[in-house]
Amino acid sequence: MKRKILFITGSRAEYGLLRKLILASAIDNDIEMSLIITGSHLSTKHGLTYKDIEKDKIKPTQKININLHGDSPKDVINSMCIAMKRFSNAFLKFKPDLIVILGDRYEIFSAASAAMILNLPIAHIHGGEVTEGAFDEAIRHSITKISHLHFVATDEFRKRIIQLGENPKTVFNVGGLGVDAIGDLKLLSKAEVEKNMNFKFGKKNLLVTVHPETRVDKRKQYKNMKSLLAALKKHTEIKFIFTMPNADQHNEQIANLIKAFCLSNSSNSSFYSSLGQLTYLSCLKYIDGVLGNSSSG
């Protein structure tokens, strides 16, 4: 009898890490693999990144829209409530033997909470990590306490999960999935990257990704972003490649500032809602540095 394993992905970064595991599970004769796509994958302003999953010839079992129509704390809470209700319905329908989740997104926390109430086993990947300035860490540790199996990237993270009270026999240091994700990729040539991005590299190039600091006041985040852009404006000799901030509260003010900056500095600044994993990683090969607070770099 096949084991029914359900994967959940809600963002481009998360899918990039889960991708090889999902593909391997899809062809395993002992596994009946299901996939739920949610979160910013289904958001137009974040590039409808579910299309990248479909390019991998993976057909999602279900798409769960959680109404990402705003970025205020109230909007996030509303999305979390919708997510919990819709995930619970999906879990009752699929009856998985194991739910596999990764990271610290609030929609993943909603899914984990629904699974906990339904007494469904959860395997959590990339727990035990620390994030300053964001409530990601609180969500991540909360998911840890809800989960049954833990797959971490380092011994330090394993120790932290055990310190949280988890049974050492359920915590496994398997390394970071990002290494596996990058290792087998055939990166694009410089010309291919330029074609995909409709962009011409300059003598100096920086990739800029700034996500909201969810535990920092909205006005302070606005001021910090304005200061960063004012500093970048002085460097006309550098070409700046901006990517979309993730779908956390107050992401819209950051995105709007970036878009306005790129519009008024179009000769050396470009904005992309999503580059896709292959183009993004290939782009890193040809730039001089990464600027911002994203772990993707």
Task: Please describe what each predicted stretch is.
Residues I8-T9, H41-G47, I146-Q221:
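A nucleotide-sugar donor-handling region in carbohydrate enzymes
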Residues K4-T9, E14-A26, I66-P168:
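Active-site and donor-binding regions of nucleotide-sugar-utilizing enzymes
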Residues I101-L102, F109, H124, H150, ...:
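A donor-sugar binding/catalytic signature common to diverse glycosyltransferases
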Residues I53, L188-Y286:
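Donor-nucleotide binding loops and adjacent catalytic segments primarily
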Residues S34-G39, H150, F240-N246:
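Short internal beta-strands
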Residues I31-V76, R86:
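Conserved nucleotide-sugar phosphate-binding/catalytic loop shared by glycosyltransferases and other
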Residues L21-I31, A231-H235:
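A short, Lys/Arg-enriched amphipathic alpha-helix followed by its capping loop at the start of a domain
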Residues G10, I37-S40, G127, G176, ...:
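Cofactor-binding loop segments of dinucleotide-utilizing enzymes, especially the Rossmann-like FAD-
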